[in-house]
Amino acid sequence: MKKLGRIHPNRQVLAFILMVFLSQVRLEPIRYSVLEETESGSFVAHLTKDLGLGIGELASRSARVLSDDDEQRLQLDRQTGDLLLREKLDREELCGPIEPCVLHFQVFLEMPVQFFQGELLIQDINDHSPVFPEREVLLKILENSQPGTLFPLLIAEDLDVGSNGLQKYTISPNSHFHILTRNHSEGKKYPDLVQDKPLDREEQPEFSLTLVALDGGSPPRSGTVMVRILIMDINDNAPEFVHTPYGVQVLENSPLDSPIVRVLARDIDAGNFGSVSYGLFQASDEIKQTFSINEVTGEILLKKKLDFEKIKSYHVEIEATDGGGLSGKGTVVIEVVDVNDNPPELIISSLTSSIPENAPETVVSIFRIRDRDSGENGKMICSIPDNLPFILKPTLKNFYTLVTERPLDRETSAEYNITITVTDLGTPRLKTQQSITVQVSDVNDNAPAFAQTSYTLFVRENNSPALHIGSVSATDRDSGTNAQVTYSLLPPQDPHLPLSSLVSINADNGHLFALRSLDYEALQAFEFRVGASDRGSPALSSEALVRVLVLDANDNSPFVLYPLQNGSAPCTELVPRAAEPGYLVTKVVAVDGDSGQNAWLSYQLLKATEPGLFGVWAHNGEVRTARLLSERDAAKHRLVVLVKDNGEPPRSATATLHVLLVDGFSQPYLPLPEAAPAQSQADSLTVYLVVALASVSSLFLFSVLLFVAVRLCRRSRAASVGRCSVPEGPFPGHLVDVSGTGTLSQSYQYEVCLTGDSGTGEFKFLKPIFPNLLVQDTGREVKENPKFRNSLVFS
């Protein structure tokens, strides 16, 4: 057994006090009786009625019958409540000479724990006859012995007790002797042969008599022994013991061959008649096996180990015989002194190896302790370690119940090894330890817990259907089916979110899949809740939030808002030949449906009728003159402007412009705007859109005024000059202008028709109108703006 460390003294004292207190409780036991040798299965009692219990309560409360010696001689029929004999009982085997013969038992019930004490009295029947240890007894008597002299004879043994035991002795009829039956202090009956008349060896040297031992049964049983009496010549004095009886105490752990006591007998005769030898007289087998006596010295020696718990004292009859055959009798009373040589015993009557974790006051084990020593050596204390959630509860007659002190938590500890220590109070102290293992069975008291309270997943748009986009994970601290987690999608809080068509979840492992291709331009982000449920009863669950962010892909090419590229009559921009370098011809307005850097647009003059005459502002799409115009320059010019985004790979679109150089216009100088600071490129998309629309508005308004003036004042030239036809057309409503900042000095007018649902709009553009009454200032010095060339892209 493994030994524990120091036992907490407070718990020891408490357990001992409770034990002593309960040992004083006198609960009246229920008593029954049965004759020995009654057949097994015989009815003893009806416990349900005797204990005042309801029908079926013995079965529902798991009633059991426990006995002190751990031998199951009784059995309980829980259904009928009958107490039955499990086996045939032999009173002599169970109790020997002890009377009355009582078997103690306990009836144990659970829920709640309850004990009832019981006693079964085994009544003796006359099933044994008296038996003498020998078949013949030789008795030597001097012929001069006087009438009335007593001669001890062999005693008979009868295993029965009471009236069925040995009652008297008789001897066969004769004229010289009769039998006197004497009662000994131990309760035994001794036969003494009493001489009735003088003897004469010469007349009758020998007698052969039959000694009969009778018990008190009905009918009586008997045993016989032959008594042979030899009449001897005179030996005047028989040996006499100096002390009788002798009394001695011997420790039960005395070694073998230890001297117990030396007896002494004296014979006042001389010669051979005065020589004394010693021996055991009518000794039982137990005494012969335990002790021996030296024939010469009279010293009694120990031949076998003593055991106080089995035999507490011995009465040894001794005999001293002289050379003439006369003998004297003596008695040695040997008291066995108890020593603490028996460790306490722990007998488990009931053990529950598995208990639920949420059940306080659950009985784990019922056990009994005992110590076969006596006095202080037999007093015991019982304890368990202090750091365990269990307590010991004494009940009765050294019975204990081990119960849970509070609800257990399997997730903290799934198994307990409990060491029960029983220590006696002897010197030195002896102890016994026994370990029991208790498994804590799981109860579904823990809900699944997600590794994160929220998850953020990133999915690039235009994904393939059934794409694995991420996983959620939850664990359950329980075990078995209580820890098996099932995942599910919970109903979205937004009733308009088609969650069932967007994502799915694997119920077993929490993997999330996109059910269809996602479009960033239609849905940038959405969120939903996932649930994790265990398979306990009842099931417990938890939930987590999942956010899905759709990443933009460069799947939209730039779209040119102005000028429209719809295949109808081209739009012609009018430029006076007197225009100075940096003169704003028009502005290409484009948007990109993507976001971020995928929507950053840049402009480039791809083709031109006359390279070097016009340039395009790279960030805002403004088309300006690059130098002074001359009469040699062609009147009509065709420009192709490339609009490209910043995606990977980049996407692009082209815008075709028609420019007509005209005479007679004034030369309004449009100063080239300062280069936008580097940080303006990082302005938000909303700012770009507002600036672009404002610029277009100004340009269109100015074009309308100029166009009306030209039509009214120079109607004759209208046919040769041409007109800008800008038919109405649909535009996606979600497009935005992310071009660079900048405004037009001319006035433009535009009309935008947008609907939130259709996603389309109508744009109407009008040409800017310049008054033709302005006179060109030919004498004004034209100075080139150095910033202009650095900001334009020339073809």
UniProtKB/Swiss-Prot annotation:
Signal peptide: 1-27
Localization in the cell: Cell membrane
PROSITE patterns in UniProt: CADHERIN_1 (PS00232), CADHERIN_2 (PS50268)
GO biological process annotation, one example: nervous system development
Function: Potential calcium-dependent cell-adhesion protein. May be involved in the establishment and maintenance of specific neuronal connections in the brain.
Cytoplasmic-facing ranges: 711-795
Residues that carry a glycan: 183, 417, 566
Extracellular side: 28-689
SUPFAM superfamilies: Cadherin-like (SSF49313)
PANTHER family in alphabetical order: CADHERIN-87A, PROTOCADHERIN BETA-4
Pfam families on file: Cadherin, Cadherin_2, Cadherin_C_2
Transmembrane segments: 690-710
Recorded topology in the membrane: Single-pass type I membrane protein
Source organism per UniProt: Pan troglodytes
Keywords: Calcium, Cell adhesion, Cell membrane, Glycoprotein, Membrane, Repeat, Signal, Transmembrane, Transmembrane helix
Listed GO CC annotations: plasma membrane
InterPro entries registered for this protein in UniProt: Cadherin-like_dom, Cadherin-like_sf, Cadherin_C, Cadherin_CS, Cadherin_N, Protocadherin/Cadherin-CA
A molecular function GO annotation: calcium ion binding
Protein name: Protocadherin beta-4
